A protein has these predicted regions:
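Conserved mixed alpha/beta catalytic, RNA-binding, or beta-rich assembly cores of soluble enzyme
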Residues: 12-13, 70-75, 89-183, 202
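Glycine-centered secondary-structure boundary/capping sites
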Residues: 3, 95-97, 155, 217, ...
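C-terminal binding/interaction regions
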Residues: 10-24, 31-53, 63-68, 79, ...
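Short, small-residue-biased leader/transition segments that mark boundaries at the very start
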Residues: 2-9
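Short amphipathic alpha-helical segments, especially helix-boundary/capping motifs
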Residues: 3, 81-86, 122-127, 184-187
Length: 255
């Protein structure tokens, strides 16, 4: 095949080894010859042809290594893995020449947390701009940063409230007085439900709600480990989330 190098020492992968003879026979039967010279030619070489911007791919790989480091640190803090697993990721980081300082969104979240003295979060949008969210009496940092990101994406003034406190306060009362929760602040899922309700009568809220798909692929960081609920919302929205390996509170049990 023109433009594809055939290596003397190919690298084999199980699925490539298994399927290559079958595909090779099919191509020879249909076209008279196979475009692939080996298992590697069919697999790794073809994947390499998909890289059209090497700088972008290298940066994406660096960010993935850093994300895995943060995930490993959090898993260790939660008792899921031991220190040896974290050490292996640290070795990988050193070999790749990357550090946590290369994750700009983490620096933004930690700076905001230091300024406010409370947990904070940050999201880096596709255009590179970083928005932050702080903990308030109404919202947790993860909920606040999602709203702020939607405002930025929709060109909405950050001074304009998308959801009236009149809507938020009854939800807080339900959580604390009826359901017995100690934390009155709204989680990410609760704020999105409140936003969708507001969107029925508020065009600005409806505009913000339409921006949700644009969060997919964005980078985010929290200054504390998020709850399972918030973590799940970020994952479902397609946001690449990392967290500092510490909890907001010193409780013995965390959900």
């Amino acid at each position: 095949m023109t433009g594809v190098q055939t290596f003397a020492l190919p690298i084999y992968y199980n699925r490539d080894v298994e399927v290559f003879p079958v595909l090779n026979a099919i191509f020879e039967k249909i076209t008279g010859e196979s475009p692939y010279k080996s298992h590697t030619d069919m697999g790794v070489n073809m994947a390499g042809n998909c890289i059209i911007d090497d700088d972008v791919c290298q940066e994406a790989s660096r960010q993935e290594i850093i994300r895995r480091y943060y995930h490993a640190r959090c898993d260790q803090r939660q008792g899921r893995i031991d220190e040896e697993a974290v050490y292996k990721v640290e070795l990988l980081m050193n070999k790749a020449g990357v550090s946590i300082q290369d994750r700009e969104v983490a620096y933004a979240a930690l700076t905001r947390a230091e300024e406010t003295g409370m947990p904070a979060a940050a999201i880096q949008l596709e255009n590179g701009k970083i928005v932050t969210g702080k903990t308030s009496s109404l919202l947790g940092a993860s909920a606040a940063v999602i709203l702020n990101a939607l405002k930025e994406l929709g060109g909405i003034s950050h001074k304009m409230p998308l959801i009236s406190p009149i809507v938020i306060e009854p939800i807080q009362n339900l959580k604390t007085k009826v359901l017995g929760n100690h934390n009155p602040r709204l989680h990410s899922d609760e704020i999105l439900i409140a936003l969708s309700i507001s969107a029925a009568t508020n065009p600005t809220a409806e505009l913000a709600l339409r921006q949700l798909p644009k969060l997919r692929g964005c980078e985010a960081h929290s200054s504390v480990i998020l709850s399972q609920v918030d973590d799940s919302v970020f994952r479902k929205l397609g946001i690449n989330l990392t967290c500092e390996a510490k909890y907001q509170t010193k409780k013995l049990y965390h959900r």
